[in-house]
Amino acid sequence: MSDIILKGKVHKYGSNVNTDEIIPARYLNTTDPTILSKYCMEDIDKNFVKNVKAGDIIVAENNFGCGSSREHAPIAIKASGISAVIANSFARIFFRNSINIGLPILESQKAVKAIENGDAVEINLTKGIIKNITKNESYQSQPFPEFMQKVIKSGGLLGYIKS
């Protein structure tokens, strides 16, 4: 399998970004990714949707995706154009939901500490290498097992099952 490479600008957040901040409950009357993406992160970053470009990357501190167990949160993030999320740690249900919908998430304390908002970052998902292009630094994260890489490359669990 060829390496999966992602590249984008960083949008950085702190600790305990919860699912209600990622996609507020008032928008949970739909599962349409396009609609959800319009409101992604609006309660903590009013300009998120306006500033995100396809391929961009979220970097956050601890316990990203905590709170309610809603699949809407990773769907909104992915549909907004974000290609991956890097954090010190993730809420476990958010971690599982992200993989299930094909949103790559990586844990790397060194990367989170060094990467700043607006930095250009390249991720080699296959090898678990996070490269800060802006600072010319690299950080190692745990690469996904081959099976999970196939799930992500297929766009999520449903895409993997269909392929």
Swiss-Prot record:
Keywords: Amino-acid biosynthesis, Branched-chain amino acid biosynthesis, Leucine biosynthesis, Lyase. InterPro entries: Aconitase/3IPM_dehydase_swvl (IPR015928), AconitaseA/IPMdHydase_ssu_swvl (IPR000573), IPMI_Swivel (IPR033940), LeuD (IPR050075), LeuD/DmdB_bac (IPR011824), LeuD_type2/HacB/DmdB (IPR011827). It comes from the Bacteria. The keyword Lyase applies. It holds the Pfam family Aconitase_C. Heterodimer of LeuC and LeuD. Catalyzes the isomerization between 2-isopropylmalate and 3-isopropylmalate, via the formation of 2-isopropylmaleate. Belongs to the LeuD family. LeuD type 2 subfamily. This is 3-isopropylmalate dehydratase small subunit.
